[in-house]
Amino acid sequence: MLVPIVVEQTGRGERSYDIYSRLLKDRIIFLGGGIDDNVANLVIAQLLFLEAEDPDKDIHLYINSPGGVVTAGMAIYDTMRYIKAPVSTICVGQAASMGAFLLSGGEKGKRYSLVNSRIMIHQPLGGFQGQATDIHIHAKEILRMKDELNALLAEHTGQSVEKVAADTERDYFMSGEEAKNYGIIDAIVTRNVVPGGAN
């Protein structure tokens, strides 16, 4: 994928940035594509960098993701909770699986979706092969993760754990309006809500 370069005029002449580095200057992190350990490490590094720059200023995490590895997503989530800077989440396109979980984990009152975005929640997926004992160990672990994710999603949405558990048994797709009613987001936006962004 070709990453666009942005050229800016400064007092010392021209300076060029890749588009993601330029967005980072405005405290915007873009999470696009599947979530794996490499993606998680990049997002976490950006969160920690922005926290060090100004722990009181909002960070804006734009999400367009089909989800991915649970442990990688949880690493991002835990870092969002760990830092002092509030993290606003904005769904553009889709936030599915771990993407939806991260969307719900943004700062209360600052979780958004664009009009035509879709959000999908479901139980964690897993596959393992090997000895029966190892399969049993992994099955227990995925059930533990499922309970943990359901409890956290219930906490962020205001839904009961029982409702979340029932809804995540299969893929549960929502429009922005449905996600708002569910409690995953706080508002649907048609205009930029990021202070300092292009309105």
Curated annotation (Swiss-Prot):
**Originating gene:** clpP
Q: What class of enzyme is it?
A: hydrolase
> What interactions and quaternary structure are annotated?
Fourteen ClpP subunits assemble into 2 heptameric rings which stack back to back to give a disk-like structure with a central cavity, resembling the structure of eukaryotic proteasomes.
Q: Which Enzyme Commission number(s) are listed?
A: 3.4.21.92
**Which cellular component terms (GO) are annotated to the entry?**
cytoplasm; endopeptidase Clp complex
Q: Which Gene3D superfamilies match?
A: 2-enoyl-CoA Hydratase, Chain A, domain 1 (3.90.226.10)
- Where would you find this protein in the cell? Cytoplasm
Q: What is this protein called?
A: ATP-dependent Clp protease proteolytic subunit
Residues the record marks as active site: 97 (nucleophile), 122
Q: Which UniProt keywords apply?
A: Cytoplasm, Hydrolase, Protease, Serine protease
Per the entry, what this protein does is: Cleaves peptides in various proteins in a process that requires ATP hydrolysis. Has a chymotrypsin-like activity. Plays a major role in the degradation of misfolded proteins.
Family that this chain belongs to: Belongs to the peptidase S14 family.
* Record-level Gene Ontology MF annotations: ATP-dependent peptidase activity; ATPase binding; serine-type endopeptidase activity
Instruction: State any GO BP term from the record.
Output: protein quality control for misfolded or incompletely synthesized proteins
User: What reaction is this protein's catalytic activity?
Assistant: Hydrolysis of proteins to small peptides in the presence of ATP and magnesium. alpha-casein is the usual test substrate. In the absence of ATP, only oligopeptides shorter than five residues are hydrolyzed (such as succinyl-Leu-Tyr-|-NHMec, and Leu-Tyr-Leu-|-Tyr-Trp, in which cleavage of the -Tyr-|-Leu- and -Tyr-|-Trp bonds also occurs)
Source organism: Geobacter sp. (strain M21)
